[in-house]
Amino acid sequence: MAERANLVFHNKEIDGTAMKRLISRLIDHFGMGYTSHILDQIKTLGFHQATTTSISLGIEDLLTIPSKGWLVQDAEQQSFLLEKHYYYGAVHAVEKLRQSVEIWYATSEYLKQEMNSNFRITDPSNPVYLMSFSGARGNASQVHQLVGMRGLMADPQGQMIDLPIQSNLREGLSLTEYIISCYGARKGVVDTAVRTADAGYLTRRLVEVVQHIIVRRRDCGTIQGISVSPQNGMTEKLFVQTLIGRVLADDIYIGSRCIASRNQDIGIGLVNRFITAFRAQPFRAQPIYIRTPFTCRSTSWICQLCYGRSPTHGDLVELGEAVGIIAGQSIGEPGTQLTLRTFHTGGVFTGGTADLIRSPSNGKIQFNEDLVHPTRTRHGQPAFLCYIDLHVTIQSQDILHSVNIPLKSLILVQNDQYVESEQVIAEIRAGTSTLHFKEKVQKHIYSESDGEMHWSTDVYHAPEYQYGNLRRLPKTSHLWILSVSMCRSSIASFSLHKDQDQMNTYSFSVDGRYIFDFSMANDQVSHRLLDTFGKKDREILDYLTPDRIVSNGHWNCFYPSILQDNSDLLAKKRRNRFAVPLQYHQEQEKERISCLGISMEIPFMGVLRRNTIFAYFDDPRYRKDKRGSGIVKFRYRTLEEEYRTREEEYRTREEDSEDEYESPENKYRTREGEGEYEILEDEYRTLEDEYETLEDEYGILEDEYRTLEKDSEEEYGSLENKYRTREGEGEYEILEEDSEEEYGSSEDGSEKEYGTLEEDSEEDSEEDSEDEYGSPEEDSILKKEGFIEHRGTKEFSLKYQKEVDRFFFILQELHILPRSSSLKVLDNSIIGVDTQLTKNTRSRLGGLVRVKRKKSHTELKIFSGDIHFPEEADKILGGSLIPPEREKKDSKESKKRKNWVYVQRKKILKSKEKYFVSVRPAVSYEMDEGRNLATLFPQDLLQEEDNLQLRLVNFISHENSKLTQRIYHTNSQFVRTCLVVNWEQEVKEGARASLVEVRTNDLIRDFLRIELVKSTISYTRRRYDRTSVGLIPNNRLDRNNTNSFYSKAKIQSLSQHQEVIGTLLNRNKEYPSLMILLASNCSRIGLFKNSKYPNAVKESNPRIPIRDVFGLLGVIVPSISNFSSSYYLLTHNQILLKKYLFLDNLKQTFQVLQGLKYSLIDENQRISNFGSNIMLEPFHLNWHFLHHDSWEETLAIIHLGQFICENLCLFKSHIKKSGQIFIVNMDSFVLRAAKPYLATIGATVHGHYGKILYKGDRLVTFIYEKSRSSDITQGLPKVEQIFEARSIDSLSPNLERRIEDWNERIPRILGVPWGFLIGAELTIAQSRISLVNKIQKVYRSQGVQIHNRHIEIIIRQVTSKVRVSEDGMSNVFLPGELIGLLRAERAGRALDESIYYRAILLGITRASLNTQSFISEASFQETARVLAKAALRGRIDWLKGLKENVVLGGIIPVGTGFQKFVHRSPQDKNLYFEIKKKNLFASEMRDILFLHTELVSSDSDVTNNFYETSETPFTPIYTI
């Protein structure tokens, strides 16, 4: 008893794996016989206990989990939110699917964990619990189906059904759940049947290929080995598994002491010594070389030492053991077992979820924002990605918690946010588990309703291939399907409806024919549109066309449609300046200058006030074509005028596109620094004096200028800015202007307030036309108020009435460089053209360099011209212009000059008395007064003299002595001739001008239409209707009615019977389709109900930004220009508020909002940050901008064609539906219902822009990666593919490519005979290693342990053949014949001639049909063919394998039969030494091999993952 007391008593459960471990320890300790006795006793004990316990199992024992209810409810709420996000276009379909799968999968997994603890706590002796968790029958996932929830099912294709089964089998399933469950169960049944057969067949083929491998000798005498070293990133467990039971191929030394010798087998003790040695000196330890079946030199058998220990008992394997069959069965059997397992949990989806980090307590979270990068999670939520391990602190009231977040995790909260306890703050990337198979899947998204497709400007309009209609998305953006119902009109030319007119519902029936009835009544023709299928009231629309005579010629209807071919052209008409090819008669054409140079300019919203320029002409004579920048000087007619002498500093934009840097001066450059955008405002020079901090006051500018850059690529990237109309009737330029009209009523005092400003900025607001595309030149900065204002009305003040006699252009160059830049030239040095100034700027002029260092930047000026040092400095008048004939007295030269020169007086450095004079060449231009209206402008305009007075004014585009910077590609226009509206103030306040586009016979004609407005222009002005253009006959157009076609009707409210027509041009020319937008698809939203003057914003509001009249449609509705929209005050750059402000969560988050920073992202992904002075008022849902303690309410922007997402808080009322704004009234706007779909980068869009889609049409195709459900049924085919060597996707293509390379290169390096051998050996060795790794991976993922050596034996048979190539015709083998590598090597040695061959990867089926025994081949497949071939060749079967002997009924050569088969020869003992002598080359060859394979295995391609998509490359288990 005393002994018994000393024994250690272990009181713990033992499961299957612990049992295995115990048994193997017992065998090691006691040997086989004794162990079996012990196990026998355990068995008896077990049965005895089971009998006495008498466990019964009834349905009541299935206890459901109490927390299931609320877990499911929580998951449902999450997926409901997800649906909403999807509906609003915030996440796309793949993200939605992915997230819903993960939500339900996580719920199901959580339930599974709960189930375990629930049983353990409430009913530990529950029979279900005892049975499944002891491992007797059933496992956790099967019990989970019974008492947890059945979860997500997979359909027969292995795709996920995203409707989860929420009930379990104990509660019973609903009808829908039952059907889905049947889907899954059917997959399970099919899997079980098919996969079991597959697994069985795999086993049969495996056994077939290796049945003849028997242990026949003790030692084959190989000197090769495979190196194993923990430094390769192997885990210790794997290291131990790889080493135990192997035999060493080389002595192992630690220091100078040998701790293990060659041919010693490795037991657990030796492994432990290795591990301690490695831990002590990790880098000095040498790799351990072991023998494996790969290194065995025999062809058709294997030796004891290369095989190692027998898996059953721990000694070296016996001679005569049939190790091949053991190997085949060991690999095949788990497959059979694992497929049977699917029968119970058939079709249940399993996937991976990420680990979450939760907040330990309530508090404010803080982390370093510089170490994270904003990103979008795979569920479409915003998050931050950590570059490195991040330290996060959570400050609660009294305690500071700190949490570490590992590398590559996603942080799901913002900095300084308030988090609650157990709130998820981060998600650890699931990339650490590489076991899930990933595959690329296409997912098609289908349209949910009929509609018209629109997309934002981010999608390329040109299709990917020339004739296809597929488009790749360059960046993430929305696609919109605008709801529509179709109607085909039968007679094309008789449709009177202009695009976007409203009409009654009854006017169209599907095939209605329209009849015209022309009745003449007192000069006014009213066209009645009759509908044969109409209701009682037949007349639907009356069009009045005053002062028109109707000719009964052929009628055309016209509409602005989005043409496929012309879409670029239309997309270019973005803003309010149009170039108009006004048509005129042929005979008048000769008298006038061609109208190409004349550009019409329609001011914003088409209002012409007094002195407004509405057309101008750039005279080519006043254009400087060369590159370079300089100064313009005037000479007025009145010579009393003093010239300005002072050099002024102007802040201009750096002209060099290579220099990209941020500095406050460069605030105004666009990001790319393309040549097209210039901001050359004279006024900016006051910035520095008035405000030290540019950032705060004018920080907004940067955003606004940058917005233009988005369009620059597509629109102005090409320099062909002339677009021909179809017939080539002359070209017209498309010019743009981005100005906003300021309606200051006269009592505003706004005119007086900045009268001075208008004079100053007048000349540069009209920069030359060529190079101002899209640039916001009209901005000017008020010196008093300090805010940016757009003035569209350009008025001439008296300053410009002065006659300028001539003006001069003097070359000069200015570079503004950052303070830090190192200059390559000195101050006051003289340089030549194209001298390098800094690292990447060169000068364009030669001359004198002056450098000024300012606080924030360096200014470098280059003055062209000569330098003179006069004797008497006082006689020279600085800054004077000297005409050519006058010569300078004090210069040495006395010859006449051809050109004007400009003399400037300069000081040298700081000394007062030394002066020098720079004489600079000037180009002179004289003004020409000879132009008159008739030569410049068409007659049609001049005939309207009585209501419209115009006068012609020349003015100079640059201020006196202002430096003009010029980009290389553009010309400088100095003088512009303008047509100015010139009526007396008291007669009319203004006119409305708009352009009308008329398409007759496929020619586009544009007319300028001017309406005279009687009322004063102020904020409260009434709104005239949008135009509805009548019919125009195609024979000719009367000149005098250019301004007469517009309809006086007001738009009625959308009643029940109102619809809006949109016309659409088909490819089919005869029948245009009309889209009818039903009233049910539109919703009207009241805008400004309660305020009397909704937009009287005070002048001090610092942000009235640039306006952009361009819908997302890519086309301008022709009448946009006369929307007198006083409600177009934008808050900021057409920003949509894209945060989801649902009412329910607003109230909770209100406390937090104060601290947050908001950035709003609009449709074109421009991001603007508002800083911290915004407060969201959750109850009124209006945005307030808090500036300088004055509250100023600015309303959200509305503009035509804008898309609005549902639930956006624009006004006091919520927007109930997503849609596109397409009618804007004074107090409301009308939305056309639309559905947004989010599409990511790389998705393919089907169909053209504006295409009509029907319900169920394919819209987008996503390609995404998804993790396969990772049961063995998915894994087995992979194993089989590798064994059959036909794996297209899983075996990395790199490996095949590398085999090719090795086969070609190594013979070239080493010469022929050895080269082929080594090339083939290397290839084979390397591919063997990667194949073993891949197969092991599949089984390990299932928790199945198979010893490497089984797989190695089979892989060895698959890779041991080479194919004789045709290069060297040898006498021995036929080209293309498959022979063993060693046989080829021996034949080459015996023949003394080179045999050319290359390594080949055979599949197991082909390897079985390429053995040395034809009997075994014939009994496997293709019996007749094999036997016939063998008979023809006269093959001999030596009956070496098992199968041949079984077939013929002989004794099989294993076990006891082995001794009869092999006669041991006395030479065996000497074999090793002989081989040593023979292989003179062996040691060298081994070195080459090791050197080369080390190179190879360090390359991660070979050993790349089995599943190419997983994140971390899988390091090799061992290298050669």
Swiss-Prot record:
Disulfide bonds: none annotated. Keywords: Chloroplast, DNA-directed RNA polymerase, Metal-binding, Nucleotidyltransferase, Plastid, Transcription, Transferase, Zinc. It comes from the Eukaryota. Residues 645-654, 664-674 have a biased composition (Basic and acidic residues). Binds 1 Zn(2+) ion per subunit. The keyword Protease does not apply. Residues 645-676, 705-786 are annotated as: Disordered. InterPro entries: DNA-dir_RpoC2_beta_pp, RNA_pol_beta''_euk, RNA_pol_Rpb1_3_sf, RNA_pol_Rpb1_4, RNA_pol_Rpb1_5, Rpb1_funnel_sf. Its EC number is 2.7.7.6. The keyword Chloroplast applies. Its cofactor is Zn(2+). It catalyses: RNA(n) + a ribonucleoside 5'-triphosphate = RNA(n+1) + diphosphate. Residues 730-748, 756-779 have a biased composition (Acidic residues). Zn(2+) binds at C220, C296, C303, C306. GO terms for biological process: DNA-templated transcription. Belongs to the RNA polymerase beta' chain family. RpoC2 subfamily. HAMAP family: RNApol_bact_RpoC2 (MF_01324). DNA-dependent RNA polymerase catalyzes the transcription of DNA into RNA using the four ribonucleoside triphosphates as substrates. This is DNA-directed RNA polymerase subunit beta''. It comes from Sorghum bicolor. The lineage of its organism: Eukaryota, Viridiplantae, Streptophyta, Embryophyta, Tracheophyta.
